[in-house]
Amino acid sequence: MGRIAMGLLGAATIAMGAGATAQQTPPPGRITTPEGAVMNSASDLAYRPGQLTPEQLNSSTANLFTGPSANVFRRYPRDKTDAMVKFYTGALALKSLSPIQLTATQQMLLTGVGHGQIKLSAGQQGNRKYDMAGGVTGGTGIRYFRLTFPDKKTVLDRFATAGFAAPKFAKQGDGTEATLVTDPGGFPIEIVIKPGAKDGSNDGVGVGINSSNLEVSRKFYRTFVGLDERKPIKDKLLGLTLYPFGRGETTLYLYHAGKNAHPDNGSAGIQYVVSDSPLADAKAKARHIAVETPLNRLAGFNLITVWLNDPDGVTNYYAQLGPRPAPAQAASGN
């Protein structure tokens, strides 16, 4: 998917994230994002009971994915915007994509990582939990992003130029060095120096997810989302055993640590660009997966989305750009 299309998807994400500065309780039946942005119901696009076979409903969403990566988003306090931009595009040197002005006072910020994006959304309104106390092991949810770079000196120079303290790297015993820093909004970023890696983490992004029940979460990402489960790995820096699940350039790292004193399901989330959001919606309903935001259209962006939650409330957001293709047929074995 080209940068223009990805930009539109980013615009929709932040349009949702930048809803109303002062959130109000929506009227009954109105569809909103966690931040309160209003969307149009797309229930007319939903598959009817009996329209899909049990095999279609119980298969994963893997064959709906388009493009070589997923996207992630990061919500943060609005007053941290300038520092966040300096951190992600200066210290980390992620590619700055064209921002989109949503209103006179609200702007969408996009950074590129390979074919995907880290989307920066100012504002933490809504009914989501924002609690990164305890860092990587403090509670459930997305607790860190993992970015890779080829050269340590270049990273150190960029941090200094951007006005941030120099990170301290430690050897990992596998030819890499790593450090853990926090962005200006208090979210951990693991930086890995890996010989041969693309600069600006253009090999993609890693997403660390602390799970309350590792087996249940692994099943969700394996059998529903349909990510490629890989062999467990040890992260020496974090002191964790990680269970990787891949989607092209994007890797989710599941783990279980701590006593879940500080669950967080609002600071970050995952977006999958797909060919048929209503089909993802149907599969979710068949398995009683929690729906964060029902099937909807976002006016002005030609976007059909459904926001689902993993077992710990992590946002797994399915976004379809453009009209839905011909409905899946029972005979297709989708």
Per-segment meaning from a language model:
Residues 120-128, 190-194, 254-257, 319-321:
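Amphipathic N-proximal alpha-helical interface segments
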Residues 115-119, 186-189, 249-253, 262, ...:
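Short, charged/polar, Gly/Pro-enriched secondary-structure boundary elements
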Residues 28-29, 34-36, 53, 63-66, ...:
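Core segments of cupin and vicinal oxygen chelate
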Residues 18-22:
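Sec/Tat signal peptide C-region and signal peptidase I cleavage site
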Residues 5-16:
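Bacterial N-terminal signal peptides
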Residues 23-79, 108-112, 129-209, 232-236, 240-246, ...:
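Vicinal oxygen chelate
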Residues 1-2:
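N-terminal secretory signal peptides that target proteins for export/translocation
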